[in-house]
A protein has these predicted regions:
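Glycine-rich phosphate-binding loops at beta-strand->alpha-helix junctions
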Residues: 4, 51-60, 176-179, 199-216
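N-terminal glycine/serine-rich phosphate-binding loop of ATP-dependent small-molecule kinases
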Residues: 2-81
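Adenine-nucleotide phosphate-binding core of ATP-dependent small-molecule kinases
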Residues: 18-19, 23-24, 162-199, 214, ...
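Gly/Thr-rich phosphate-binding beta-strand-loop-beta motif of the actin/hexokinase/Hsp70
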Residues: 1-16, 105, 109-131, 147
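Conserved phosphate-binding/catalytic loops in two-lobed NTP-binding clefts
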Residues: 70-82, 218-233
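Glycine-rich phosphate-binding loop plus the immediately following alpha-helix
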Residues: 103-109, 132-176, 235, 239
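Short beta-strand segments
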Residues: 51, 76, 114-120, 204-206
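Conserved phosphate-binding catalytic cores of ATP/NTP-utilizing and phosphoryl-transfer enzymes
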Residues: 82-112, 231-241
Length: 241
């Protein structure tokens, strides 16, 4: 992702190892230090599938695995997944993470709205086995950082859920504004999608702040913390059939 990289080792559909890296720290020394633990899986690694939205970072990690594991990485978007997922928009403009999220939920019968809380807050619309498009809104933490940078008297704030709409100090007012503001944004976008498409959807939340907003909607919401990596695994299994 733009902020963090999640690396998961799967065995029989179960995660046996999970590593999180900072995207802006990726270089050979950093990768050797943090990924050396994967060497015990070296001979068992059958396939490495990458879901990248930062091309330069992907190139460095791809070279690392080629050099130290003698294993090639494949980028999800470069694979032919047309029989797995029908893409109804310009595929070149879909981030690999959003594509992986869509692949993760498709079941050929239900409609889904996936909300991914990351650097951006993404909404993706999936009908049966088709990716129909989505909405991109500013990410919460990114917006908080920009507010602090642009407004001299606004401090850096670690975002927390607010129970009171009216804040009693600057920090509580900011948390209130962002929590209730984004709750309204999320609710309005989802209901607008439902109204415009005239369809029923299952709502899936994923990403770092997903649990915080789960109960802010009147609609039923399911949390899937490993949605993206599960989608990558599903694509890998499809290709190995």
């Amino acid at each position: 992702g733009n902020t963090d990289i999640k690396i998961c080792v799967y065995k029989n559909k179960n995660i046996v190892k999970k590593i999180r890296l900072s995207t802006n720290k990726v270089n050979l020394k950093y990768l050797k230090k943090n990924l050396n633990v994967l060497r015990k899986y070296d001979k068992k690694l059958k396939q490495i599938l990458f879901c990248s939205v930062v091309p330069n970072c992907y190139k460095k990690i791809k070279n690392y695995f080629k050099l130290y594991f003698n294993t090639n990485c494949n980028e999800l978007k470069n694979l032919n997944l047309s029989k797995l997922l029908s893409i109804k928009v310009n595929s070149k403009q879909i981030g690999s993470d959003r594509l992986a999220n869509a692949i993760s939920v498709i079941d050929n019968k239900n409609n889904y709205i996936v909300v991914d809380f990351g650097t951006a807050t993404n909404f993706d619309v999936i009908s049966a086995n088709s990716y129909n498009g989505g909405v991109i809104a500013p990410g919460i933490n990114l917006s908080l950082e920009n507010l602090s940078k642009k407004a001299f008297l606004i401090p850096n704030v670690k975002f927390k859920k607010s129970n009171n709409v009216v804040g009693k100090n600057t920090i509580s007012a900011i948390n209130s504004g962002f929590f209730f503001g984004y709750s309204g944004l999320i609710d309005n976008i989802i209901h607008s999608i439902i109204k415009q498409t005239k369809k029923k959807y299952k709502i899936i939340f994923t990403g770092g702040l997903a649990k915080m907003f789960k109960n802010s909607l009147k609609l039923k919401v399911k949390i899937k913390s490993n949605l993206t990596t599960d989608g990558v695994l599903k694509a890998a299994m499809y290709l190995n059939k």
